[in-house]
Each structure stands twice: as structure tokens, then as C-alpha cells.
């Protein structure tokens, strides 16, 4: 997934879940990792990082 799609997905997740979005993304990443899907786990880690950045900006 390219960077723009990751950011867009993070925005939608943040809009839907607010401050819980980062935890939601982390859970998805863990679930994919547990299932052996490291590619999707990496995508969700990137989404989590993007949500984290959004939360930091939102708190300022």
C-alpha cells in the first residue's frame, strides 16, 4: 500500500474511532502478525504510526 493510501486509511480510522484509532490499528497489526501475514502487519503498523502523528497534531 502506498503512502497516500496509508494516510487516507489512517484519516478514516481516526475519524471513525478518534483517540482509540491507534489502538485499533495496533490490534489489527498484531492479529495479522499472529496469522503469519507479515505484509499486512507492516501495513497496519504504518497506519498506526500515521494515526499516532495525527493524534499528536490533534492534541497541540
What are the language-model segments listed below?
Residues 49:
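N-terminal cationic and glycine-rich segments that engage phosphates or anionic surfaces
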Residues 1-27, 31, 35, 39, ...:
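Long, non-catalytic architectural segments outside compact domain cores
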Residues 38, 42-46:
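Short, charged, amphipathic alpha-helical segments
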Amino acid at each position: 500500500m502506498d503512502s497516500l493510501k496509508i494516510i487516507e486509511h489512517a484519516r478514516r480510522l481516526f475519524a471513525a474511532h478518534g483517540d482509540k484509532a491507534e489502538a485499533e490499528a495496533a490490534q489489527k497489526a498484531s492479529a495479522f502478525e499472529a496469522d503469519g501475514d507479515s505484509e499486512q502487519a507492516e501495513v497496519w503498523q504504518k497506519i498506526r504510526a500515521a494515526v499516532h502523528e495525527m493524534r499528536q497534531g490533534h492534541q497541540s
